[in-house]
Amino acid sequence: VEILKYFKKKKGVYFNKKGWYLIGCEMPIQITPIKTYSNVVFVGYLDIVMYHEPTNTIKIIDIKTSKTTWNKKKKNDKGVRSQLILYKYFFSKLYDFPIENIEIEFFIVKRKLYENCDFVQKRIQIFVPPSGKTSINFSLKIVNDFIKRCFEPNGKIIEQHYKKNISEWSCRFCPWKFDEVNCPKNPKLLKLLKIA
């Protein structure tokens, strides 16, 4: 409720009405990333899509909630950034809209404010990830590699053991992080499960 009150009061700061038109909310996109894998479809729902008529620009906004604002680590997480970058790329392909005229941004809504704080806190943080050619190619490679590794061209799932992508971040809430025997990072356990 507090978030909505804050947003109603400050909406003009985040959304300018002049020349902007709302294209859609929760706008679905469906596309086949690799033509030879016609049964493997990328599906996404774009939270907010807006059009700026004077500059012929589309803006895709992805709303995220967070306990606090995003730190440097979260902003640099290429997996998180890839979602919006792929939305930009596939929107361009699907609607034949110039990719250089598509902007993307994360609209991060902060759930918690610090008590007894000496400075004014904002409930909303805007983060615009880099989305040039290099970022697009990186994100496409992730998706294409995943499709080729996990699916046959007819769309059938390739049954096999897949190596876990374990990072220090995933250990944070793991129930076995202090259990040497059951820890997924334990090399002996990985060898036993044949996923190392």
Kindly give the residue locations of the regions a language model identified.
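Catalytic cores of nuclease domains that cleave nucleic-acid phosphodiester backbones
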Residues: V1-W70, D96-E100
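Short amphipathic alpha-helical face segments that pack within enzyme cores
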Residues: S82-F90
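Metal-dependent nuclease catalytic regions and adjoining charged, substrate-binding loops involved
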Residues: Y89-A196
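Short, low-complexity, polar/charged sequence segments that are solvent-exposed and flexible
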Residues: D47, V80-S82, I124-P130
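A generic fold-level signal
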Residues: V41-V43, G79, I166
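Generic domain-boundary/flexible-linker signal
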Residues: N71-K72, E115
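Short alpha-helix boundary/capping segments
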Residues: K72-S82
